[in-house]
Amino acid sequence: MARNKIALIGSGMIGGTLAHMIGLKDLGDVVLFDIAEGIPQGKGLDIAQSSPVDGFDSRLTGVNDYAGIEGADVCIVTAGVPRKPGMSRDDLLGINLKVMEQVGAGLKKYAPKAFVICITNPLDAMVWALQKFSGLPKTHVVGMAGVLDSARFRYFLAEEFKVSVEDVTAFVLGGHGDSMVPMIRYSTVSGIPLPDLVKMGWTSKEKLDQIVQRTRDGGAEIVGLLKTGSAYYAPAASAIAMAESYLKDKKRVLPCAAHLSGQYGVKGTYVGVPVVIGAGGVERIIEIDLNKSEQKMFESSVATVQGLTEACVKIAPQLASK
Protein backbone atom coordinates (compact mmCIF):
# COMPACT_ATOMS: atom_id res chain seq x y z
CA MET A 1 0.00 0.00 0.00
CA ALA A 2 1.43 3.37 -1.05
CA ARG A 3 2.23 5.76 1.76
CA ASN A 4 0.64 9.19 1.86
CA LYS A 5 2.78 11.99 0.46
CA ILE A 6 2.62 15.24 2.40
CA ALA A 7 4.27 18.34 0.96
CA LEU A 8 5.23 21.24 3.21
CA ILE A 9 5.57 24.47 1.26
CA GLY A 10 7.91 26.52 3.41
CA SER A 11 10.57 25.02 5.68
CA GLY A 12 10.70 27.57 8.46
CA MET A 13 9.78 26.97 12.09
CA ILE A 14 6.24 25.78 11.34
CA GLY A 15 7.42 23.64 8.42
CA GLY A 16 10.06 21.87 10.49
CA THR A 17 7.63 21.29 13.35
CA LEU A 18 5.04 19.92 10.92
CA ALA A 19 7.57 17.50 9.43
CA HIS A 20 8.49 16.11 12.84
CA MET A 21 4.84 15.76 13.90
CA ILE A 22 3.97 13.93 10.67
CA GLY A 23 6.71 11.43 11.45
CA LEU A 24 5.63 11.00 15.07
CA LYS A 25 2.02 10.41 13.99
CA ASP A 26 3.10 8.19 11.07
CA LEU A 27 0.87 10.09 8.63
CA GLY A 28 3.09 9.52 5.60
CA ASP A 29 6.26 10.58 3.80
CA VAL A 30 7.29 14.23 3.84
CA VAL A 31 8.62 16.58 1.19
CA LEU A 32 9.96 19.83 2.61
CA PHE A 33 10.03 22.62 0.00
CA ASP A 34 11.74 25.98 0.33
CA ILE A 35 13.31 28.50 -2.04
CA ALA A 36 16.34 28.77 0.28
CA GLU A 37 18.87 26.13 -0.78
CA GLY A 38 20.00 23.78 1.96
CA ILE A 39 17.28 24.68 4.47
CA PRO A 40 14.73 21.96 3.55
CA GLN A 41 17.49 19.41 2.96
CA GLY A 42 19.12 20.18 6.32
CA LYS A 43 15.88 20.13 8.30
CA GLY A 44 14.76 16.95 6.55
CA LEU A 45 18.04 15.22 7.38
CA ASP A 46 17.97 16.40 11.00
CA ILE A 47 14.41 15.14 11.53
CA ALA A 48 15.16 11.88 9.70
CA GLN A 49 18.03 11.27 12.10
CA SER A 50 15.56 11.52 15.00
CA SER A 51 13.48 8.68 13.52
CA PRO A 52 15.52 5.80 15.03
CA VAL A 53 15.01 7.37 18.47
CA ASP A 54 11.36 8.32 17.98
CA GLY A 55 10.53 5.11 16.13
CA PHE A 56 9.03 6.25 12.84
CA ASP A 57 9.70 5.28 9.23
CA SER A 58 8.53 8.36 7.34
CA ARG A 59 10.88 9.33 4.53
CA LEU A 60 11.85 13.01 4.58
CA THR A 61 13.10 14.77 1.47
CA GLY A 62 14.13 18.40 1.04
CA VAL A 63 13.67 20.14 -2.32
CA ASN A 64 13.98 23.59 -3.91
CA ASP A 65 11.86 22.80 -6.98
CA TYR A 66 8.07 22.48 -7.06
CA ALA A 67 8.50 19.31 -9.14
CA GLY A 68 9.37 17.62 -5.85
CA ILE A 69 5.81 17.96 -4.56
CA GLU A 70 4.34 16.14 -7.57
CA GLY A 71 1.42 13.88 -6.67
CA ALA A 72 1.19 15.05 -3.05
CA ASP A 73 -1.95 13.97 -1.19
CA VAL A 74 -1.79 16.91 1.21
CA CYS A 75 0.04 20.24 0.90
CA ILE A 76 0.46 22.51 3.91
CA VAL A 77 1.47 26.04 2.97
CA THR A 78 3.50 28.07 5.45
CA ALA A 79 5.61 30.00 2.92
CA GLY A 80 5.86 33.74 3.40
CA VAL A 81 7.05 36.31 5.91
CA PRO A 82 6.06 35.89 9.59
CA ARG A 83 5.02 38.71 11.90
CA LYS A 84 7.43 40.66 14.05
CA PRO A 85 6.64 42.83 17.09
CA GLY A 86 4.41 45.78 16.22
CA MET A 87 3.14 44.18 13.01
CA SER A 88 -0.43 43.05 12.41
CA ARG A 89 -1.16 40.05 10.20
CA ASP A 90 -2.53 42.48 7.62
CA ASP A 91 0.87 44.21 7.28
CA LEU A 92 2.12 41.09 5.50
CA LEU A 93 -0.46 41.19 2.71
CA GLY A 94 1.58 42.67 -0.16
CA ILE A 95 4.64 40.47 0.37
CA ASN A 96 2.82 37.22 1.00
CA LEU A 97 0.33 37.68 -1.85
CA LYS A 98 3.23 37.38 -4.31
CA VAL A 99 4.32 34.21 -2.52
CA MET A 100 0.79 32.76 -2.86
CA GLU A 101 0.90 33.40 -6.62
CA GLN A 102 4.07 31.31 -6.92
CA VAL A 103 2.73 28.58 -4.63
CA GLY A 104 -0.57 28.51 -6.52
CA ALA A 105 1.23 27.94 -9.82
CA GLY A 106 3.24 25.10 -8.26
CA LEU A 107 0.11 23.43 -6.87
CA LYS A 108 -1.74 23.79 -10.16
CA LYS A 109 1.06 22.11 -12.11
CA TYR A 110 2.24 19.43 -9.71
CA ALA A 111 -0.42 18.71 -7.06
CA PRO A 112 -3.85 19.52 -8.52
CA LYS A 113 -5.53 16.70 -6.55
CA ALA A 114 -4.08 17.62 -3.16
CA PHE A 115 -5.94 18.76 -0.08
CA VAL A 116 -4.34 22.13 0.65
CA ILE A 117 -4.10 23.73 4.09
CA CYS A 118 -2.93 27.34 4.13
CA ILE A 119 -1.31 28.85 7.23
CA THR A 120 0.27 31.97 5.70
CA ASN A 121 -0.98 35.33 7.05
CA PRO A 122 -3.13 37.33 6.67
CA LEU A 123 -4.82 33.95 6.61
CA ASP A 124 -8.33 34.52 5.27
CA ALA A 125 -7.13 36.68 2.37
CA MET A 126 -4.17 34.40 1.55
CA VAL A 127 -6.25 31.20 1.37
CA TRP A 128 -8.78 33.04 -0.84
CA ALA A 129 -5.98 34.15 -3.19
CA LEU A 130 -4.29 30.74 -3.12
CA GLN A 131 -7.48 29.00 -4.24
CA LYS A 132 -7.84 31.44 -7.12
CA PHE A 133 -4.18 31.27 -8.17
CA SER A 134 -4.16 27.44 -8.03
CA GLY A 135 -7.60 26.78 -9.49
CA LEU A 136 -8.01 23.82 -7.11
CA PRO A 137 -11.54 22.94 -5.92
CA LYS A 138 -12.81 25.17 -3.13
CA THR A 139 -13.54 22.06 -1.05
CA HIS A 140 -9.84 21.19 -1.19
CA VAL A 141 -8.31 24.54 -0.22
CA VAL A 142 -8.83 25.58 3.41
CA GLY A 143 -7.21 27.89 5.91
CA MET A 144 -5.88 26.93 9.32
CA ALA A 145 -7.00 29.53 11.82
CA GLY A 146 -10.08 28.46 13.75
CA VAL A 147 -8.49 25.29 15.14
CA LEU A 148 -5.62 27.37 16.51
CA ASP A 149 -7.77 30.22 17.82
CA SER A 150 -10.14 27.71 19.42
CA ALA A 151 -7.22 25.86 21.01
CA ARG A 152 -5.99 29.10 22.54
CA PHE A 153 -9.49 29.86 23.80
CA ARG A 154 -9.81 26.36 25.28
CA TYR A 155 -6.40 26.60 26.97
CA PHE A 156 -7.18 29.96 28.59
CA LEU A 157 -10.57 28.66 29.77
CA ALA A 158 -8.99 25.51 31.23
CA GLU A 159 -6.48 27.68 33.09
CA GLU A 160 -9.28 29.88 34.46
CA PHE A 161 -11.39 26.94 35.64
CA LYS A 162 -8.42 24.77 36.69
CA VAL A 163 -9.71 21.80 34.71
CA SER A 164 -8.27 19.57 31.99
CA VAL A 165 -8.18 21.09 28.50
CA GLU A 166 -9.76 17.82 27.34
CA ASP A 167 -13.00 18.75 29.10
CA VAL A 168 -13.24 22.20 27.51
CA THR A 169 -14.98 22.61 24.16
CA ALA A 170 -14.91 25.99 22.50
CA PHE A 171 -14.68 27.47 19.05
CA VAL A 172 -14.08 30.73 17.28
CA LEU A 173 -15.88 32.14 14.24
CA GLY A 174 -14.84 34.78 11.72
CA GLY A 175 -11.51 36.02 10.44
CA HIS A 176 -8.11 35.17 11.90
CA GLY A 177 -7.35 38.52 13.48
CA ASP A 178 -8.57 41.15 15.89
CA SER A 179 -12.15 40.74 14.65
CA MET A 180 -12.44 37.00 15.42
CA VAL A 181 -15.56 35.96 17.34
CA PRO A 182 -14.98 33.52 20.25
CA MET A 183 -18.35 31.86 20.83
CA ILE A 184 -19.01 31.96 24.59
CA ARG A 185 -22.57 30.66 24.25
CA TYR A 186 -21.44 27.51 22.41
CA SER A 187 -18.45 26.81 24.66
CA THR A 188 -18.65 24.31 27.52
CA VAL A 189 -16.79 22.61 30.34
CA SER A 190 -17.80 18.94 30.35
CA GLY A 191 -21.07 19.92 28.67
CA ILE A 192 -21.86 22.87 30.98
CA PRO A 193 -22.19 26.10 28.93
CA LEU A 194 -19.98 29.02 29.96
CA PRO A 195 -22.97 31.31 30.77
CA ASP A 196 -24.15 28.67 33.27
CA LEU A 197 -20.68 28.54 34.83
CA VAL A 198 -20.91 32.30 35.40
CA LYS A 199 -24.26 31.76 37.19
CA MET A 200 -22.64 28.99 39.25
CA GLY A 201 -19.96 31.42 40.42
CA TRP A 202 -17.04 29.72 38.67
CA THR A 203 -16.06 32.93 36.89
CA SER A 204 -17.44 36.33 35.96
CA LYS A 205 -18.57 37.89 32.71
CA GLU A 206 -15.72 40.39 33.05
CA LYS A 207 -13.17 37.58 33.34
CA LEU A 208 -14.63 35.83 30.30
CA ASP A 209 -14.40 39.08 28.35
CA GLN A 210 -10.70 39.28 29.30
CA ILE A 211 -10.17 35.70 28.09
CA VAL A 212 -11.93 36.50 24.81
CA GLN A 213 -9.62 39.48 24.30
CA ARG A 214 -6.54 37.43 25.19
CA THR A 215 -7.65 34.87 22.60
CA ARG A 216 -7.89 37.62 19.97
CA ASP A 217 -4.41 38.80 20.97
CA GLY A 218 -3.02 35.26 21.30
CA GLY A 219 -0.70 35.43 18.32
CA ALA A 220 0.50 38.95 19.09
CA GLU A 221 1.28 37.94 22.69
CA ILE A 222 3.65 35.24 21.46
CA VAL A 223 5.18 37.51 18.80
CA GLY A 224 5.87 40.08 21.52
CA LEU A 225 7.57 37.50 23.73
CA LEU A 226 9.63 35.82 20.99
CA LYS A 227 10.60 39.15 19.37
CA THR A 228 12.11 37.39 16.33
CA GLY A 229 9.15 35.49 14.90
CA SER A 230 5.72 34.07 15.55
CA ALA A 231 4.08 30.94 17.01
CA TYR A 232 4.83 27.57 15.44
CA TYR A 233 4.09 24.64 17.78
CA ALA A 234 0.34 25.27 18.17
CA PRO A 235 -0.17 26.31 14.51
CA ALA A 236 1.58 23.12 13.37
CA ALA A 237 -0.49 20.93 15.72
CA SER A 238 -3.67 22.59 14.43
CA ALA A 239 -2.80 21.95 10.77
CA ILE A 240 -1.93 18.33 11.59
CA ALA A 241 -5.42 17.82 13.09
CA MET A 242 -6.93 18.99 9.79
CA ALA A 243 -4.60 16.88 7.63
CA GLU A 244 -5.20 13.77 9.74
CA SER A 245 -8.98 14.18 9.50
CA TYR A 246 -8.66 14.30 5.69
CA LEU A 247 -6.18 11.43 5.31
CA LYS A 248 -8.04 9.11 7.71
CA ASP A 249 -11.55 10.25 6.68
CA LYS A 250 -12.25 11.01 10.35
CA LYS A 251 -14.97 13.57 9.55
CA ARG A 252 -13.98 15.78 12.45
CA VAL A 253 -15.89 18.99 13.07
CA LEU A 254 -13.22 21.68 12.99
CA PRO A 255 -13.41 25.47 12.69
CA CYS A 256 -11.54 26.40 9.50
CA ALA A 257 -11.35 29.24 7.00
CA ALA A 258 -13.65 27.77 4.35
CA HIS A 259 -15.15 29.14 1.14
CA LEU A 260 -18.73 30.28 1.75
CA SER A 261 -21.23 30.23 -1.10
CA GLY A 262 -24.27 31.64 0.68
CA GLN A 263 -23.90 30.10 4.12
CA TYR A 264 -24.20 32.67 6.92
CA GLY A 265 -25.34 35.11 4.22
CA VAL A 266 -21.80 35.30 2.80
CA LYS A 267 -20.75 34.56 -0.79
CA GLY A 268 -17.33 34.19 -2.38
CA THR A 269 -15.32 34.77 0.80
CA TYR A 270 -13.16 32.53 2.97
CA VAL A 271 -13.99 32.94 6.64
CA GLY A 272 -13.75 30.84 9.78
CA VAL A 273 -16.73 28.54 10.37
CA PRO A 274 -17.19 24.98 11.68
CA VAL A 275 -16.81 22.39 8.92
CA VAL A 276 -16.65 18.61 8.56
CA ILE A 277 -13.33 17.45 7.07
CA GLY A 278 -13.17 13.97 5.56
CA ALA A 279 -11.84 12.21 2.48
CA GLY A 280 -13.88 14.59 0.31
CA GLY A 281 -12.14 17.63 1.79
CA VAL A 282 -14.58 20.13 3.28
CA GLU A 283 -17.62 17.86 3.16
CA ARG A 284 -20.06 20.08 5.02
CA ILE A 285 -20.26 23.63 6.34
CA ILE A 286 -22.15 23.79 9.62
CA GLU A 287 -24.41 26.83 10.05
CA ILE A 288 -25.12 27.61 13.67
CA ASP A 289 -27.74 30.04 14.93
CA LEU A 290 -26.29 33.40 15.92
CA ASN A 291 -27.99 35.88 18.21
CA LYS A 292 -28.03 39.58 17.29
CA SER A 293 -24.80 40.38 19.10
CA GLU A 294 -22.94 37.41 17.61
CA GLN A 295 -24.31 38.16 14.14
CA LYS A 296 -23.12 41.76 14.37
CA MET A 297 -19.60 40.69 15.40
CA PHE A 298 -19.50 38.02 12.69
CA GLU A 299 -20.59 40.50 10.00
CA SER A 300 -17.92 42.94 11.18
CA SER A 301 -15.31 40.18 10.96
CA VAL A 302 -16.45 39.22 7.45
CA ALA A 303 -16.27 42.88 6.38
CA THR A 304 -12.67 43.03 7.60
CA VAL A 305 -11.79 39.93 5.57
CA GLN A 306 -13.53 41.31 2.48
CA GLY A 307 -11.52 44.52 2.85
CA LEU A 308 -8.35 42.45 2.69
CA THR A 309 -9.47 40.51 -0.39
CA GLU A 310 -10.29 43.80 -2.11
CA ALA A 311 -6.76 44.96 -1.27
CA CYS A 312 -5.45 41.76 -2.89
CA VAL A 313 -7.34 42.54 -6.09
CA LYS A 314 -5.78 46.01 -6.21
CA ILE A 315 -2.32 44.45 -6.04
CA ALA A 316 -3.14 41.53 -8.39
CA PRO A 317 -6.09 42.59 -10.62
CA GLN A 318 -6.15 39.17 -12.33
CA LEU A 319 -7.72 37.76 -9.14
CA ALA A 320 -10.97 39.55 -9.98
CA SER A 321 -11.49 37.39 -13.07
CA LYS A 322 -10.56 34.03 -11.53
From Swiss-Prot:
InterPro entries: L-lactate/malate_DH, Lactate/malate_DH_C, Lactate/malate_DH_N, Lactate_DH/Glyco_Ohase_4_C, Malate_DH_type3, NAD(P)-bd_dom_sf. Substrate binds at residues 83, 89, 121, 152. The gene is mdh. Belongs to the LDH/MDH superfamily. MDH type 3 family. Keywords: NAD, Oxidoreductase, Tricarboxylic acid cycle. It catalyses: (S)-malate + NAD(+) = oxaloacetate + NADH + H(+). This is Malate dehydrogenase. It holds the Pfam family Ldh_1_N. The active site is at residue 176.
